């Protein structure tokens, strides 16, 4: 899991790479996004604004997409662990790009302005004590992306 302190730092770290630039464009478009409505750029990037106050019971893992969270309001704990240290509860489904696991991991707390990138070799679960508002992006892991954009 990568935690980046703010959007400017994200821009500097990921200055090259079209898919990361598209993430910044999506985040900058949040004033035009209704909560809960998903938008996409082909199948290489999807994004939505959500307000979340639920705690995940299980860890979630992905294989084809990084999950990126940009926090707009509030703070949230995230428990994460390498997938190989967790026990599979529901096997990976290609249709959803998800697998569910259980176990114990390391916990971090993130807050407004920070960006979290969930790596595909790890699984994570979000722990909420209060509602958080964030932009959730799913970004392809593939190198060949956004050819027509």
Swiss-Prot record:
GO terms for biological process: single-species biofilm formation. It comes from the Bacteria. InterPro entries: NanQ/TabA/YiaL, NanQ/TabA/YiaL_sf. Gene3D superfamilies: YhcH/YjgK/YiaL (2.60.120.370). One of its GO terms (cellular component) is cytosol. Required for full activity of the EbgA enzyme. Exact function not known. Heterooctamer of 4 alpha and 4 beta subunits. This is Evolved beta-galactosidase subunit beta. The lineage of its organism: Bacteria, Pseudomonadati, Pseudomonadota, Gammaproteobacteria, Enterobacterales. The gene is ebgC.
């Amino acid at each position: 899991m990568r935690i980046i302190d703010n959007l400017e730092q994200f821009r500097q770290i990921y200055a090259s790479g079209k898919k990361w630039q598209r993430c910044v464009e999506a985040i900058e478009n949040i004033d035009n996004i209704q909560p809960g409505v998903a938008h996409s750029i082909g199948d290489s990037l999807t994004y939505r604004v959500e307000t979340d106050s639920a705690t995940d019971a299980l860890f979630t893992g992905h294989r084809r997409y990084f999950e990126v969270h940009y926090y707009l309001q509030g703070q949230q704990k995230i428990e994460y662990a390498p997938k190989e240290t967790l026990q599979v509860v529901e096997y990976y489904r290609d249709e959803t790009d998800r697998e569910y696991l259980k176990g114990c991991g390391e916990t971090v707390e993130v807050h407004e302005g920070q960006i979290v990138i969930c790596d595909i070799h790890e699984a994570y679960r979000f722990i909420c004590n209060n509602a958080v508002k964030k932009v959730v992006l799913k970004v392809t892991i593939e190198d060949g992306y956004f050819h027509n954009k």
